Amino acid sequence: GMAQHPQVIGAMVDVAARMGTGAGGTRNIAGTNHPLVELERELADLHGKEAALLFTSGYVSNQTGIPTIAKLLPNCLILSDALNHNSMIEGVRQAGCEKQVWRHNDVAHLEELLKAADPERPKLIIFESLYSMDGDIAPIHAICDLADKYGAMTYVDEVHAVGMYGPRGGGVTERDGAADRVDVIEGTLAKA
């Protein structure tokens, strides 16, 4: 793989010589560094977003990102696709708010749940763009149409699609021209 490519190894050696091999602690303790900030800018640009935030893994980003967003929205209702990854399910558990599970990629069922919810209640729809276990691709535009109609936020896990889909590798949201419609795009630097 790319981890053994001579140019990748050379770039790593160069950066290690200039910057060191680690911060010695997490960002909140040891601070940040210029290459990390630059990488976040590049990732935000890749997805057409205002900003990006790096985590230690895709699992951790879902596990902490979902509950953080939900806790910022008082009385949030999370609507989760039935086949979401365990990291997303764990994030929903940690959010501690009400959740409803919609049948996999079934936008009619999702709409039933949205229609039954209090229109004033904050809602977060979470789903994957490309499901790893069966290769299904989410109907992103249809989900975003429902989010617009019912005033919900959208959170898509692009872990299995980043680097593989879209002209710049931004994932299924980029390929389908939907990145600007999704509120939060979660990805990884390790899968594709």
Predicted regions and their residues:
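Active-site PLP attachment segment
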Residues: 168, 174-192
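Conserved PLP-anchoring active-site segment centered on the Schiff-base-forming lysine
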Residues: 66-86
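Short, structured coil segments at secondary-structure junctions
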Residues: 94-96, 150, 180-181
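Active-site phosphate-binding strand-loop segment of PLP-dependent enzymes
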Residues: 100, 104-156
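Conserved N-terminal alpha-helix of the aminotransferase class I/II PLP-enzyme fold
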Residues: 9-57
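Hydrophobic beta-strand scaffold residues
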Residues: 23, 78, 99, 154-155
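Conserved Walker B
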Residues: 26, 130, 158-160
